[in-house]
From Swiss-Prot:
UniProt keyword terms in alphabetical order: Cell junction, Cell membrane, Cytoplasm, Cytoskeleton, Glycoprotein, Membrane, Nucleus, Phosphoprotein, Repeat, SH3 domain, Transport
Protein's UniProt name: Sorbin and SH3 domain-containing protein 1
SH3 domain segment(s): 1049-1108, 1123-1184, 1229-1290
Molecular function GO terms recorded: insulin receptor binding; protein kinase binding; signaling receptor complex adaptor activity; ubiquitin protein ligase binding
Lineage: Eukaryota, Metazoa, Chordata, Craniata, Vertebrata
Gene that produces this protein: Sorbs1
Modified residues (Phosphoserine): 55, 58, 62, 185, 204, 209, 254, 261, 270, 345, 376, 407, 432, 969, 1201, 1209
Residue span, SoHo domain: 202-247
Length: 1290
């Protein structure tokens, strides 16, 4: 065994050739050397000469070969080398050391279409390529399927397992499989050479065309072949040769033991031959292998009851399909790696998380759906379906030999094959064509179904692959935690929803096998999940409770399913299968008109539905599911309370009203949709909720009573029509006029003329979407003034009035608004056809389909009160006519005004109404019934001329008054008969708006111009620098504008009255109370001044000039008689911050005049005009001055610290701290006395404490707004804020 290991490890594959078994190194036969560009010279090795050409040999035969290797002559050795080269070139050599170490094989797995012999790089077969290289494709095969080595690496096994089919195919085509005795006989090589020379089997055309030789016959390198080799190598490296059960996440079962039947992925012929070879040569017969997972077992070899292989196969992450035919959805994708705890069916989804479902379920049923009951049904339902399918499937599947292919059913034959969502549709197609028979048995199918029930995988073809004549195919439903990321071909694409005769006669009694139950919530959004078909009458009574809890059910289905399902009516499975839907609608013709949606009504009258309109039908059916409302059950007088639940419960009584015969003659047929079912159910519920939540009008007694009075009071109202009603032809409703009463709706000539004028005016005054906000337009989307408008006691008067649409925000139909407007504008010319006969066809116009239009196109007609003549056919309407003549003088005639709060009178509306009533004169040909229409408009609001025409919400008294009271914004109702005056009114309104906007723009522009002019400082150059530092008396005095700088005597102080924020660098920011010193006046609006050492400009209006007595000026010294001057020397440089401070340099001699206080001296520098005060700590006092005053300063201990304001310790006597001269205590002319306005607590040592009312003698006013002075109360000297005091003489 060790020798065999050495044999396997010593062989090296260089460019695809095995280096060995050639002869001694000295016998360098040029015919045995591969030459050419880029080739590698290969020499024959003297060792292991007798190794046979076919690499795999059994362990028992290997010693025999080695013993005979030394006995063979040179020629047979060369022939053996040629055989070995040919075998290695075609991928049948022993594994290389790299392969033994676990690396991937670089030998290609050739396709069945190109059985080329040598795709490797250097294309070397032998020197006799013209004779022998073509005669020796890899034909010799041992009985062993694995290499003769004890190092059984799984990668080696897999590589050999992948390479065997190609050689077996060629061996099967060209020569029978030889036995081991034949291969190991001494004369076997020469015998096969002679036999193959006689047969001269030619290689493929590609090999003949690609192989080129030189004059000696040595094959040259072919660049194209090299590229092909690289391509093949790349594909081989990235190819995943999965066995059928290697990927538990994507099951691909073969339901047959027939190994000729292809599996789900199209196999090459070599792979099929390998499957055949597995019958003859079993792997276990040749070499004992270590325990491997089931990924290396064939499908027939694996036990179906064996547990699933859960080992991670990393090859699937490198899997790439080589062609579109091998593409399998979900493979090598993120879905492969996703693991779910268990399968989720739509019944298990918590519908309470859906806001719309929670709201409407509570609104209609009073409590949420009992989901626990639904979930208990779901488990039993699936098991029952599987058992029934198994039972039904026994006889047909026994007769059907083909078990692994999906054949198209009659339901999908009309669809294009591209719609079939099968993971291997093309492969299935090929297999169904190329597999005439199989060995499928009932036991195999039964085991598959048991595996499914036990938690196993359902095949990708679905259970429909077993040719069962039951309902639609199912996906894997694994309740044990397995993956279920693949949806069968019938569950995702709704075009092939019924893939197995779902509508066929044999399976109408069965429910679909949970086709939409697996992972729908993980793949599709909640609103677009496919819904299940409705079960028929056999299973409906037990399982109908499951259907209302589906994820994507509409509100109509939630409340109608219990009623309609008992009649076997199928619910919608999605808007995209309308052909099947319409077919099932025709099968079940018993669907009532109240539950049949309007789009179905439209499509049934225009069959067959064209395929080009599928996209529109998708949206319309989905929209209808969300918005359809059944209004037939809400009869007048049947509701005693006004609660929302009571009102909503009456929307569900369509079947009762049909049974009572309360519908009109034109609404009795199942194919006709009554006009009162037009508006959206959700819209009505939103109206009820909005009314109950925010509007005070909850008195429905007038509208819900059987008295025709409120019905007749709405005679002037016009209907809000959707865009579809404008675009749809009237000939689609030929039978609607048959059911009309003899006394028509608009029997009154006043109303007829009014309608005629409104219709004629309609095209000239289109609805302007920009002038009305979207919320306003939403309110009047589906209001329909139907035929019961003028027949209060007739059969139409029993139905409720339609409420305004408030479908806002998330409504999908709101996005169709603009296109609907454009379609109406483009087709406005077509309206002239039915405008002429609007009186007769008025009812048919009201019966149009209101599906997708939240935006109405109202007839431009006033909503008002005017006299109306009662129809001659109905005498019960005469009180209503008399009531209409007197516009609501009696408070009892206002049923909707009761309970509403008083609204303040809109005086502006009445002024405008009065102006309109005087300015807009009606034409002479105006009907007499419209005398009061002139004052119907006020900024889009219907405002009658008197209080009697209004309810308490200032809305007209009509049956729609409550609905119009819900509107938060005005409506644009224009008198239909005043064409000219209306245009003038619109133009006048437009002009008024333009004038108002022009005035506002003008005022704004003037203000901006004034601001710009006021801040035009481009020519203003400040006389000083922006910032003034302590060095301003030095360098700043050297600038050219020194003359412009005013002295402290010339600068006038001013105080800021308001805060001023600078907007440019030239402006000086001020706070209220700041004292600024004005340098100059720039213009009549701006000053230039200084504040806190910064120079800038500020507005004149922001400051107030201080009186001349408050000028900041150097303090005139008191007439003090100096007896003896003192003397001091400066220790430091001192820069004065104010005008009274004296600056000096270190070392200068200073003459002391007097001591101001304990911290400051007053002095001058001899020989200069500089005089002022300075801190004591900055100088060394050599001699103190003597001043003749009534009270002299005592000798105070002064500190030599550099602090400018060193304070005496509190332990010193009070007299020593506050010793002042008598002229300080007496206000002199040189000092300004101020009175404190506020109290001030000192923050620093040199600050003065102030109390409200204190008198302070100010000696200095600093330019930063601080004053220096002495308090008369405390006799202390210090600084304090200037805005805390006021002049005493004021």
């Amino acid at each position: 065994m060790s020798s065999e290991c050495d044999v396997g490890s010593s062989k090296a594959v260089v460019n695809g050739l095995a280096s060995g078994n050639h002869g001694p190194d000295k016998d360098m036969d040029p015919t045995k050397i591969c030459t050419g560009k880029g080739t590698v010279t290969l020499r024959a090795s003297s060792s292991y000469r007798g190794t046979p050409s076919s690499s795999p040999v059994s362990p028992q035969e290997s010693p025999k070969h080695e013993s005979k290797s030394g006995l063979e002559p040179e020629d047979p050795s060369a022939d053996e080398w040629k055989l070995s080269s040919s075998a290695d070139t075609n991928g049948n050599a022993q594994p290389s050391p790299l392969a033994a170490k676990g690396y991937r094989s670089v030998h290609p797995s050739l396709s069945a279409d190109k059985p080329q012999g040598s795709p490797l790089l250097n294309e070397v077969s032998s020197s006799h390529i013209e004779t022998d290289s073509q005669d020796f494709p890899p034909t010799s095969r041992p009985s062993s399927a694995y290499p003769s080595t004890t190092i059984v690496n799984p990668t080696i096994v897999l590589l050999q397992h992948n390479r065997d089919p190609a050689s077996e195919r060629r061996a099967g085509e060209q020569d029978p499989v030889p036995t081991p005795a034949e291969l190991t006989s001494p004369g076997r090589a020469s015998e096969r050479r002679a036999k193959d020379a006689s047969r001269r089997v030619v290689r493929s055309a590609q090999d003949l065309s690609d192989v080129s030789t030189d004059e000696v016959g040595i094959p040259l390198r072919n660049t194209e072949r090299s590229k092909d080799w690289y391509k093949t190598m790349f594909k081989q490296i990235h190819k995943l040769n999965r066995d059928d059960d290697s990927d538990v996440h994507s099951p691909r079962y073969s339901f047959s033991d027939d190994t000729k039947s292809p599996l789900s992925v199209p196999r090459s012929k070599s792979e099929m031959n390998y499957i055949e070879g597995e019958k003859v040569v079993k792997r276990s017969a040749t070499l004992p292998l270590p325990a491997r997972s089931s990924s290396l077992k064939s499908s027939p070899e694996r036990n179906d009851w064996e547990p699933l292989d859960k080992k991670v196969d990393t090859r699937k992450y490198r899997a790439e399909p080589k062609s579109i035919y091998e593409y399998q959805p979900g493979k090598s994708s993120v879905l492969t790696n996703e693991k779910m705890s268990r399968d989720i069916s739509p019944e298990e989804i918590d519908l309470k998380n859906e806001p719309w479902y929670k709201f409407f379920s509570e609104l209609e049923f009073g409590r949420p759906t009992n989901l626990e009951k639904d979930l208990s049904f779901c488990q039993a339902e699936l098991e029952a379906d599987l058992e029934k399918v198994e039972t039904v499937n026994k006889s047909p599947s026994a007769n059907s030999p083909q078990s692994s292919a999906v054949s198209p059913t009659p339901d999908i034959t009309s669809e294009p094959p591209g719609y079939i969502y099968s993971s291997n549709f093309h492969a299935v197609k090929r297999e169904s064509d190329g597999t005439p028979g199989g060995l499928a048995s009932l036991e195999n199918e039964r085991q598959i179904y048991k595996s499914v029930l036990e938690g196993g995988d359902i095949p990708l073809q679905g259970l429909s692959g077993l040719k069962r004549p039951s309902s639609s195919a199912s996906t894997k439903v694994d309740r044990k935690g397995g993956n279920a990321h693949m949806i069968s071909s019938s569950s995702v694409h709704s075009r092939t929803f019924h893939t197995s005769n779902a509508l066929g006669p044999g399976c109408k009694h069965k429910k679909p096998l949970s086709a939409a139950k697996a992972c729908i919530s993980e793949i599709l959004p909640s609103k677009f999940k496919p819904r299940l078909s409705a079960p028929s009458a056999l299973l409906q009574e037990q399982k109908s409770v499951l259907l209302p809890s589906e994820k994507a059910q509409s509100c109509e289905n939630l409340c109608v399913s219990l009623n309609d399902s008992k009649r076997g009516l199928p619910l919608r499975v999605g808007g995209s299968i309308e052909n099947l839907l319409m077919r099932s609608r025709r099968d079940y013709d018993s669907k009532s008109s109240s539950t049949m949606s309007l789009q179905e009504y439209g499509t049934s009258s225009r069959r067959p539905c064209p395929l080009s309109r599928k996209a529109g039908l998708h949206f319309s059916m989905f929209y209808r599911d969300m918005h359809q409302i059944n209004r037939a059950g809400l009869s007048l007088g049947s509701i005693s309370s006004s609660s929302v639940r009571d009102l909503a419960s009456h929307f569900e009584r369509s079947s009762l009203t049909l049974a009572r015969g309360e519908l009109g003659a034109s609404q009795e047929g199942s194919e006709h949709i009554p006009k009162h079912t037009v508006s959206s159910r959700i819209t009505a519920f939103e109206q009820l909720i909005q009314r109950s939540r925010s509007m005070p009008s909850l008195d429905f007694s007038g509208r819900l009573s059987k008295s025709p009075t409120p019905v007749l009071s709405r005679s002037g109202l016009t209907s809000a029509r959707s865009a579809e009603s404008l675009l749809e032809s009237t000939k689609l409703r030929p039978r609607e006029m048959d059911g009309m009463d003899s006394g028509g709706v608009y029997a009154s000539p006043t109303c007829s003329n009014m309608a005629d004028h409104a219709l004629s005016f309609r095209s000239l005054v289109p609805s302007e979407p920009l002038s009305i906000c979207s919320d306003e337009l939403d309110h009047c989307s589906n209001v329909s003034n139907d035929s019961r408008e003028g027949s209060g006691g007739s059969v139409h008067g029993d139905f409720p009035k339609h409420r305004l649409n408030k479908c806002k925000g998330t409504c999908p139909a709101s996005y169709t608004r603009f296109t609907t407007i454009r379609k109406h504008e483009q087709q406005s010319s077509r309206q002239s056809d039915w405008r002429s006969d609007s009186r007769g066809d008025k009812n048919s116009l009201l019966r149009n389909i209101h599906l997708m239009s939240p935006l109405p196109f109202r007839l431009k007609k006033p909503l008002q009160q005017h006299p109306r003549q009662p129809p001659p056919s109905d005498s019960s309407e005469s009180p209503a006519g008399q009531k209409a003549d007197l516009p609501c003088h009696d408070p009892q005639d206002q049923p909707h005004s009761a309970g509403k709060p008083q609204v303040p009178t809109r005086l502006s509306s009445r002024h405008t109404m009065a102006r309109l009533s005087h300015n807009s004169e009606p034409p002479l040909d105006r009907p007499a019934g419209l005398e009061d229409c002139t004052r119907a408009i006020n900024n889009g609001n219907p405002v009658p001329y008197s209080d009697h025409g209004l309810d308490r919400n200032n809305n007209p008294q009509s049956e729609l008054a409550a609905a119009h009271g819900d509107s938060e914004s005005p409506r644009h109702f224009i008198p239909a008969d005043y064409l000219e005056s209306t245009e003038e009114f619109i133009r006048r309104r437009h002009d008024d708006k333009e004038k108002l906007l022009a005035d506002q723009r003008r005022l704004k522009r003037e203000q901006e111009e004034a601001d710009i002019a006021a801040r035009r400082h481009t020519g203003v150059i400040p006389t000083h620098h922006q910032f003034i530092t302590n060095e301003r008396f030095g360098d700043l005095l050297n600038i050219d504008d020194t003359a412009k700088r005013k002295s402290g005597l010339e600068m006038r102080p001013a105080r800021a009255k308001f805060d001023f924020k600078a907007q440019t660098l030239k402006e000086l920011p001020l706070q209220k109370g700041d004292v600024v010193y004005i340098y100059r006046q720039i213009d009549q609006n701006w000053y230039e001044g200084e504040h806190h050492g910064r120079v800038g400009i500020f507005p004149r209006t922001y400051i107030e000039l201080l009186p001349p007595a408050e000028k900041a000026q150097p303090r005139k010294l008191a007439p003090v008689q100096v007896l003896e001057y003192g003397e001091a020397i400066a220790k430091f440089n001192f820069n004065g911050d104010t005008q009274v401070e004296m600056s000096f340099r270190k070392g200068e001699r200073i003459t002391l005049l007097r001591q101001v206080d304990e911290n400051w001296y007053e002095g001058r520098i001899p020989g200069t005009s500089r005089q002022g005060i300075f801190p004591i700590t900055y100088v060394d006092v050599l001699k103190r001055p003597l001043v003749k005053t009534p009270v002299d300063y005592i000798d105070l201990p002064y500190s030599s610290s550099p602090s400018r304001s060193a304070t005496v310790s509190p332990q010193q006597p009070q007299a020593q701290q506050r010793r002042v001269t008598p002229d300080r205590s007496q206000p002199s002319l040189d000092l300004c006395s101020y009175q404190a306005l506020y109290s001030y607590v000192p923050q620093n040592d040199d600050e003065l404490e102030l109390r409200d009312g204190d008198i302070v003698d100010v000696m200095e006013k600093c330019d930063d707004g601080w004053f220096v002075g002495t308090s008369r109360r405390t006799r202390q000297f210090g600084t304090f804020p200037g805005n805390y005091v006021k002049p005493l003489y004021l």
